[in-house]
Amino acid sequence: MADKLEFELVSPEKLLVSQPVAMVVVPGADGLFGVLPGHAPMIVTVRPGIIDVYGDNQTTVSRRIFVAGGFAEVTDTRCTVLAEEASDLDALLKSDTAALEKQISDLREDIEDATSDVERRALETRLVTTQAKLDLIASQQDAEAA
């Protein structure tokens, strides 16, 4: 068994990560799952959350990336995440929380005013993603304060 697997993170805009890693932990729809070299093949839905990338070993996180959801394909040598939106956690933590709260308020109003199910679902997806960002920032601030 190889000691590394290839990890790729792709958003609609660009390829964000393509590197060999020791392990990645992905927020799946049914909970977090870790991927090591030799993992059984699977395709899963990714929920909004943080991907932890372990570059050199399985004990030290080398990079943390927020994803807004998507899909992951896992093989024995590769983990590819197709994310609807992704950003480094450090960049996300610098976000203006007041602006995010305003977006949430506006999205809730837009959902109430939506004229079709398609429009409503798209707005609800944006609301879930924006709320996940705000919750993540709050939890990181709470952890730093403790």
Curated annotation (Swiss-Prot):
Location within or outside the cell: Cell inner membrane
CDD domains listed in its UniProt record: F1-ATPase_delta
UniProt topology in membrane: Peripheral membrane protein
Key words, A-Z: ATP synthesis, Cell inner membrane, Cell membrane, CF(1), Hydrogen ion transport, Ion transport, Membrane, Transport
Chief location bin: membrane
Matching Gene3D superfamilies: F0F1 ATP synthase delta/epsilon subunit, N-terminal
Entry GO MF terms: ATP binding; proton-transporting ATP synthase activity, rotational mechanism
GO CC annotations, alphabetized: plasma membrane; proton-transporting ATP synthase complex
Subunit structure, interactors included: F-type ATPases have 2 components, CF(1) - the catalytic core - and CF(0) - the membrane proton channel. CF(1) has five subunits: alpha(3), beta(3), gamma(1), delta(1), epsilon(1). CF(0) has three main subunits: a, b and c.
HAMAP family xref list: ATP_synth_epsil_bac (MF_00530)
Family: Belongs to the ATPase epsilon chain family.
NCBIfam families associated with the record: ATP_synt_epsi
Biological function: Produces ATP from ADP in the presence of a proton gradient across the membrane.
Annotated protein name in UniProt: ATP synthase epsilon chain
Source organism of this protein record: Rhodospirillum centenum (strain ATCC 51521 / SW)
Gene: atpC
